[in-house]
Amino acid sequence: MAPFEPLASGILLLLWLIAPSRACTCVPPHPQTAFCNSDLVIRAKFVGTPEVNQTTLYQRYEIKMTKMYKGFQALGDAADIRFVYTPAMESVCGYFHRSHNRSEEFLIAGKLQDGLLHITTCSFVAPWNSLSLAQRRGFTKTYTVGCEECTVFPCLSIPCKLQSGTHCLWTDQLLQGSEKGFQSRHLACLPREPGLCTWQSLRSQIA
């Protein structure tokens, strides 16, 4: 692998020239879905400028991890995550960090590839302070309870039909036009009894 180097203006111009005209698009997931489908979920600060690998056109951000919520076994003997990797072009779903506040903490949910943390623009990356208290409770403790049995089932158009008793119908985008609606900010899809999952409030579980 070629060494990473600071992302210079010339590289930015090159990426802009060769980038396809159509940008990457994806449907933001419910936070529980993001947690369950990720290999690693951490809280971290972005502390360095992006560096690009000129051969692979991947870039990496230096981060300082402050908390890990998922991935202890997947990470193995590695005690820390120092970098997060992403495609260098937004058109192929590369994540571009907009904040210049290096003291701000972010919730990062990503995939591990060869021991490296990878994210895209479709990954769940959000300022920790922007999460509701219920979402923080979900990431720190509760979402994991629903990962094995339960599935958040997106409803994007009418009619919506559940395919299983273990599915919870997610209607935020249909009813409110945003993935940041009530179900996303305050509820988790959790087992009620064997073979049945329901939306349950996270607010009532906050100590």
UniProtKB/Swiss-Prot annotation:
Detected in rheumatoid synovial fluid (at protein level). The record marks 57, 158 as: Involved in metalloproteinase-binding. Keywords: Disulfide bond, Glycoprotein, Growth factor, Metal-binding, Metalloenzyme inhibitor, Metalloprotease inhibitor, Phosphoprotein, Protease inhibitor, Secreted, Signal, Zinc. It is found in: Secreted. Residues 24-27, 90-91, 179-180 are annotated as: Involved in metalloproteinase-binding. The modification Phosphoserine is found at residue 178. SUPFAM superfamilies: TIMP-like. Disulfide bonds join 24-93, 26-122, 36-147, 150-197, 155-160, 168-189. SMART domains: NTR. Glycans are attached at residues 53, 101. GO terms for molecular function: cytokine activity; growth factor activity; metalloendopeptidase inhibitor activity; peptidase inhibitor activity; protease binding; zinc ion binding. One of its GO terms (biological process) is negative regulation of metallopeptidase activity. It holds the Pfam family TIMP. Residues 24-147 form the NTR domain. Changing residue 25 to V: Normal interaction with metalloproteinase. Its main location: secreted. CDD domains: NTR_TIMP. InterPro entries: Netrin_domain, TIMP, TIMP-like_OB-fold, TIMP_C, TIMP_CS. The activity of TIMP1 is dependent on the presence of disulfide bonds. Belongs to the protease inhibitor I35 (TIMP) family. Interacts with MMP1, MMP3, MMP10 and MMP13, but has only very low affinity for MMP14. Interacts with CD63; identified in a complex with CD63 and ITGB1. This is Metalloproteinase inhibitor 1. The gene is TIMP1.
